[in-house]
């Protein structure tokens, strides 16, 4: 599930970039408003769940395994949580403008903000995919994977 979410994050980062260009050349029409709303929903819901999956479910299990295997993961895990915090802060600034675009009240996105967010996501995903996920794939057992999957599904359950 985490790898699939990473791919969707990449797709939505690209959509955000395309929306910025679209607004510059076409303007804020219904298509831009709809795209803006879709991007907001994805980052507000799916990414929030994804961060919770990692921070509340995956990382605690990996830290415990790391201690037993004598593999120091504290620094990598701390960096990941710090990255998530910075991503959330950067997203907040873009979100306010996207919200205005979704209602036709705003016509422009800051390409530097988009670029910063996309680069930060790219760097974070690369770190996860080259350091954290290989460790998880090597050390997690079927039962642990099933428990993590169940927690992820429960997090997404409609309430």
Mark where each language-model region is.
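Small-residue-biased structural context
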Residues: 1-159
């Amino acid at each position: 599930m985490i790898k699939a979410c990473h791919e969707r994050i990449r797709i939505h980062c690209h959509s955000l970039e395309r929306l910025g260009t679209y607004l510059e050349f076409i303007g804020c029409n219904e298509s831009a408003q709809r795209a803006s709303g879709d991007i907001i929903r994805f980052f507000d819901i799916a990414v929030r769940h994804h961060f919770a999956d990692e921070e509340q479910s995956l990382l605690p299990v990996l830290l415990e395994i790391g201690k037993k295997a004598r593999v120091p993961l504290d620094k990598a895990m701390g960096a990941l949580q710090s990255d998530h915090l910075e991503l959330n802060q950067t997203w907040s600034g873009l979100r306010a403008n996207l919200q205005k675009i979704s209602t036709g009240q705003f016509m422009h996105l800051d390409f530097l903000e988009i670029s910063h967010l996309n680069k930060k996501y790219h760097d974070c995903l690369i770190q996860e995919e080259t350091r954290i996920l290989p460790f998880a794939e090597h050390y997690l057992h079927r039962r642990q994977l099933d428990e993590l999957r169940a927690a992820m599904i429960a997090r997404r359950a409609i309430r």
